[in-house]
Amino acid sequence: MAKERIIGIDLGTTNSVVSIMEGGQPIILENPEGQRTTPSVVAFKNEDIIVGGAAKRQAVTNPNVVISVKSKMGTNEKIDINGKKYTPEQISAEILRYMKKYAEEKVGEKITKAVITVPAYFNDSQRKATKDAGKIAGLDVERIINEPTAAALAYGLEKKDKEEKVLVYDLGGGTFDVSILELADGTFEVLSTSGDNKLGGDNFDTQIINWLIEKIKTESGVDLKNDKMALQRLKDEAEKAKINLSSQLEVEINLPFIAMNENGPVSFSTQFSRTEFDKITKDLVERTSKPVKDALQAAKLSASDIDEVLLVGGSTRIPAVQKIVKELLGKEPNRSINPDEVVAMGAAIQGGVLAGDVTDVLLLDVTPLSLGIETMGGVMTKLIDRNTTIPTEKSQIFSTAVDNQPAVDINVLQGERPMAADNKSLGQFQLTGIKPAPKGTPQIEVTFKIDVNGIVSVIAKDKATNEEKSITISNSGALSDADIEKMIKEAEANAEADEIKRKNIELKHKAESYVAIIESSLTQEGQEIPQEQKEQAEKMVAEVKELIEKEDYEALETKVNELEQMIQMASQFAQAQTAQPEEGNSDSEENK
């Protein structure tokens, strides 16, 4: 029986990617739309769940579209969809399930195992939430690895005979990480990591959106900051402008009928330059400096010690970002890797290592934040320092604070601040049964363990009685094993029906989009279209609407090609209508 392969998934804030080892090399698996990246977007329509590009295209018109859910992982926040509460893990699981399914279709075999990447600066709760999401999606998550580490794996796979110090600058959709690794003889050792979990491409989009809101308000008097539909359109345009400004010095932003004021519909158009973009996002670019310097300091290295700089994440295509990287490190970044795909490829390589398909590769990662407990006076006492290589284990003896104390409360903390209240509490438990004794006499041994996934467990033991209590820190979203199992069973039970629904909803959405295009063309250019063709189009639209209403998807499918022909006809008339005034203007100029 063939050995099961392990896929690598980059579960991103904006986009996600899946990869697998093929012939000793990681390859990217395209989604059903033929794209190598899949938008991390989930849409709910009636009882249907849509993922990826089809979901993203509904973002303007459908209020039940969830984007950037990764930023909510490891929190207690719930997403309300038509009165039903979803956890971030459930939403992420829909993305993972979709990717698992199309990966299976691509490779022609069942897939149950995955390596999933997370930002290096994800805390314990966020890592556990990611594992839970994988479990709900029907995946056994063999390993959670840090995104910059995965990128370095992909970069260094063919360079196992070289010795290099590599800095990975990873600016994604919602998070920013910096990791420094030493590559030597197939060993990838993380020397340090730093980052900012609240900095990414979404922040750059927000700056453009705010700039547009002010411009529109100045020109028309309309304030769009509370108009959800308009804001989604602004976000789409902001993202497009940001991407285009990586290769152009100026772009045009067009927002027809973006709002209404006392004079009627408001349309907005403006030129947006790279200079203006750099100006309004300067503070975001500069925020990346400190984590770079912190990572160098933690690794006890200077910029000149770095041999290669790898850029990861779509946001590193921004020219101002590339400029600051060069200024900080004194060298041009390595451009041999695809910043959107390299993390998933690294995850696939790690999957190959775990499956035994990739040999002579050893990954030594680190914990991004210090771990400890709260002690007398509300102080955080650290047991494991940040940037300690994992897996690891550390013990320390503590005692009681008052005479005859029968129990001790253990508050497990993660962070770098000296006071307990300023750090994240991962969980609390109580060790009871301590024999009566003067304060400071009992010996309580506290042991921290971090596994290869960066997930923490803590044991407290009374040395006198051998009384012991332990806790594996669970996701603060508080999904129990029973909750996860229930979600898995629901997904399995509805898999076939869900697939039929997915195909039908995509067909319906396609038909509705075509109908809207034709109706718009008939309204705007109706007088120019020959009556016979106009009547034919109106009849076709009516038939399609009736099929949609009846949910006759088999018949609807046969109409899609005819609809496409109608759109071509409408497009031709629109182009002709646009060209006529230009010809007229030209004639009038000649006659002057």
From Swiss-Prot:
InterPro entries: ATPase_NBD, Chaperone_DnaK, Heat_shock_70_CS, HSP70_peptide-bd_sf, Hsp_70_fam
Entry keyword Phosphoprotein: yes
MF terms in GO: ATP binding; ATP-dependent protein folding chaperone; unfolded protein binding
Keywords: ATP-binding, Chaperone, Nucleotide-binding, Phosphoprotein, Stress response
Region of interest called Disordered, as start-end residue ranges on this chain: 571-592
Electron transport as UniProt keyword: no
Transmembrane spans: none
Disulfide bonds, paired cysteine numbers: none
Induction (UniProt): By stress conditions e.g. heat shock.
Modified residues (Phosphothreonine): T175
CDD domains cross-referenced by the UniProt entry: ASKHA_NBD_HSP70_DnaK-like
Biased composition (Polar residues): 571-580
NCBIfam families: PRK00290.1, prok_dnaK
Family as reported in the entry's similarity comment: Belongs to the heat shock protein 70 family.
Function, in words: Acts as a chaperone.
Protein name: Chaperone protein DnaK
Organism name: Mesoplasma florum (strain ATCC 33453 / NBRC 100688 / NCTC 11704 / L1)
